[in-house]
């Protein structure tokens, strides 16, 4: 199932109005293992609808039919020019803002509250998928949740899909106070990483991989984008999600055995 939800709010505050959703229902496989529910966080000054368009146009049905994807818009309208204006119409959104040198952050805590509120109302979600700014945010959340700094009212984030991401703080970036300690030790959360050979965040992506225990990495020849899945990459993605589906199935069986 694919869905897209957007806010209607001002930069100064985060409001939570009714959402408009677009949904496509996917069938469960014969194994009866349920599809992982994934909250998808788009890149800087883009939108959930744009990320949805990119993924559905570049990833094959063999992958998409086994996933339940929900594409959320960031809480804040874009505060400047978007790099994708030539290709996609507005509106565009941001998850949070930073100073020119990425040394000071604004609205990061408000962003955390906004994401958690959506997860409460529309979850539960099993994992997160993030691209660019959405990947920076997603990568930090499992440890922040573990430390009680974010997502304290929703179930544990069980896995991550990180495309063109990096660490908060990164090699060239400052650090929001709430994210202190997000990578103080290896992150024990199953993770799938996409790193582009021509991506300006390639180095940040490589450093991010080192912060996770047993990460799965797909390297591609493209730049800062959602890559098409060639045969080998498709097999890697399918294998990763089959492992996730089994993990979710085993957890459900364990819960039922205790009832």
Could you say what each language-model-derived stretch is?
Residues 150-165:
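A conserved short beta-strand
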Residues 197-215:
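Conserved loop-alpha-helix segment in the C-terminal half of the alpha/beta-hydrolase fold
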């Amino acid at each position: 199932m694919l869905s897209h939800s957007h806010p209607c709010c001002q930069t100064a505050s985060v409001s939570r109005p009714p959402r408009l959703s677009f949904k496509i229902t996917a069938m469960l496989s014969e194994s009866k293992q349920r599809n992982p529910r994934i909250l998808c966080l788009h890149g800087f000054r883009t939108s959930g609808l744009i990320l949805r368009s990119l993924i559905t146009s570049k990833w094959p049905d063999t992958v998409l039919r086994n996933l339940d994807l929900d594409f959320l818009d960031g809480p804040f309208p874009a505060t400047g020019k978007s790099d994708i204006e030539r290709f996609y119409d507005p509106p565009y959104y941001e998850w949070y803002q930073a100073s020119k040198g990425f040394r000071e952050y604004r609205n990061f805590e408000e962003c955390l509250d906004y994401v958690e509120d959506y997860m409460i109302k529309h979850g539960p979600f099993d994992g997160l998928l993030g691209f660019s700014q959405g990947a920076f945010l997603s990568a930090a959340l499992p440890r922040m949740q573990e430390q009680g700094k974010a997502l304290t009212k929703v179930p544990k984030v069980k896995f991550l899909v990180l495309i063109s991401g990096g660490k908060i703080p990164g090699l060239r970036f400052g650090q929001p106070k709430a994210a202190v300690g997000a990578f103080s030790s290896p992150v024990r959360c199953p993770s799938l990483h996409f790193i582009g050979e021509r991506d300006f965040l390639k180095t940040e992506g490589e450093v991010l991989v080192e912060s996770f225990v047993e990460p799965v990495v797909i390297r591609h020849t493209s730049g800062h984008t959602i890559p098409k899945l060639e045969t080998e990459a498709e097999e890697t993605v399918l294998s990763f999600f089959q492992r996730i589906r089994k993990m979710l199935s085993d957890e459900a069986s364990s819960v039922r055995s205790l009832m």
